[in-house]
Amino acid sequence: MEVPNIQTCIDSGQFGLKEPWCPKNSNDKYGGVLTLKKAIAGSINTVTTFLMKQIGPSPVSSMAKSLGITSRVPVVPSIALGTLDLSVYELVGAYTAFGNKGLYTEPIVILRIEDKNGVLLEDFSPTTREVFSPEVAYTVVNLLEGVTESGTGIRLRHSGGKYRYNVVTDYPYNFTNPIAGKTGTTQNNSDGWFIGMVPNLITGIWTGCQDRSAHFGITEFGQGATTALPIWAILMKD
């Protein structure tokens, strides 16, 4: 599927909007057509808005709940761009369905409790449920692999511009193994995210302040690829 990279508006009256919603790309660049994989890799808002206009926010909100999101998910178009507040716990849990062939697995902290003699007192098993087919899960993982192959997470693969040596911690990383993931950056560069998946492991990183008035002045410094992704990379290398 290819989508034109043009600013897309959802008109007032649609999905309960009181005024038109016309989000821009973060770099304010447009033109050409993009595959979904390329658009996700580059965090292209116009394509995400196009999809939201076709699907509507209600199915997206319902899917989020099926994926273990317990925070309130407002049924509004802007959720397509990640405007709701979620915990790392919720996001990592949601990603388990992509890595487990469509099977959501609730993250748990304690697996078993033993006494001082090693006698098992309690054994805990995570709650699981099928959310979508293995084929859908595979497709999503393939799309997310594009993020580290050619998109906002490509600095996991190679060094790029030399200026980043002074900006990104412990750079470069030079990973060659399969990695699927997604960076995230909130309004005004106050929060940075990276959720990364390798076979048998999903790890989520959030950076930011409880007070959103504390933020980076420019996206180059405040984006998830600069703030959260390096922490993920250092953790994986260790």
Predicted regions mapped to residue ranges:
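Conserved catalytic neighborhood of penicillin-recognizing serine enzymes
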Residues: M1-V60, Y104, E114-G146
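A penicillin-recognizing enzyme superfamily signal
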Residues: K38, G42, S87-D238
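Short polybasic/polar patches that bind polyanions
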Residues: K53, K65, G99
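Conserved short-loop catalytic and cofactor-binding motifs
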Residues: T48, I79-G82, T128, E220
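Short, charge-rich amphipathic segments
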Residues: K18-V33, T70-S78, I154-Y171
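Thr-Gly-centered strand-to-loop micro-motif
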Residues: F50-L51, L81, G181-K182
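Extracytoplasmic/periplasmic beta-strand context in beta-sandwich domains
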Residues: M1, P77-I79, I108-L111
